Amino acid sequence: MERLLIVNADDFGLSKGQNYGIIEACRNGIVTSTTALVNGQAIDHAVQLSRDEPSLAIGMHFVLTMGKPLTAMPGLTRDGVLGKWIWQLAEEDALPLEEITQELASQYLRFIELFGRKPTHLDSHHHVHMFPQIFPIVARFAAEQGIALRADRQMAFDLPVNLRTTQGFSSAFYGEEISESLFLQVLDDAGHRGDRSLEVMCHPAFIDNTIRQSAYCFPRLTELDVLTSASLKGAIAQRGYRLGSYRDV
């Protein structure tokens, strides 16, 4: 039986270099899906590029760790800006869950305003939606809106009955050792688990000033090279995978 493979590029809207990399990986590679940061500095550029690439499925990359929120979040911001101190708040069980709930709804409405349609699915920047305190909020919201959600089933969360997600999710195509063999190993591992549907996360980009400031910089360019490799699409098909998006889940 044919298996579904979703290759999702995170960070659409982060920068122009990121946006161009994602479009290139869709147009000339195997990326089928992306998730957009509605508060990203290059989100308007991302919207513009997406109009010329209708085959690219676009979901929402919920942001709680970067930039300015769309709502007042005094319990999570410092000087009006979001940051990685959210991990400390989570450890202290001090997350402002009502503020997070309101921000999620606001980012969702902003996505629809920008792209003119609902996102195909939800995930989050730095995987914050997988925090045990936050996941029930996001899962319930996705189910209510009728959209899919990136979920790591190994986390063993209780999922809403009507929530759509893939059987498998992998973030292993990441780091300093990016290669075609690594990507194919991710598929083989999922096959051994018996996953009938799989999302693989990626971050293809061209380098610009914003990406240069990221702790994860040059591997994004290597990812782009691998994801547009002439041989990769054939190797994926040989393993019994069909490229698709969360529309197919």
UniProtKB/Swiss-Prot annotation:
CDD domains noted in UniProt: YdjC_EF3048_like
InterPro entries: COD_ChbG_bac, Glyco_hydro/deAcase_b/a-brl, YdjC-like
Superkingdom field: Bacteria
UniProt keyword list: Carbohydrate metabolism, Chitin degradation, Cytoplasm, Hydrolase, Magnesium, Metal-binding, Polysaccharide degradation
Enzyme Commission number(s) of this protein: 3.5.1.105
Family named by the database record: Belongs to the YdjC deacetylase family. ChbG subfamily.
Function: Involved in the degradation of chitin. ChbG is essential for growth on the acetylated chitooligosaccharides chitobiose and chitotriose but is dispensable for growth on cellobiose and chitosan dimer, the deacetylated form of chitobiose. Deacetylation of chitobiose-6-P and chitotriose-6-P is necessary for both the activation of the chb promoter by the regulatory protein ChbR and the hydrolysis of phosphorylated beta-glucosides by the phospho-beta-glucosidase ChbF.
GO cellular component, one term: cytoplasm
Binding site for Mg(2+): H61, H125
A GO molecular function held by the record: deacetylase activity
Pfam families for the chain: YdjC
Protein name per the record: Chitooligosaccharide deacetylase
Pathway: Glycan degradation; chitin degradation
The UniProt record lists the keyword Metal-binding: yes
Annotated SUPFAM superfamilies: Glycoside hydrolase/deacetylase
Lineage: Bacteria, Pseudomonadati, Pseudomonadota, Gammaproteobacteria, Enterobacterales
Gene3D superfamilies assigned to the protein according to its UniProt record, in alphabetical order: Glycoside hydrolase/deacetylase
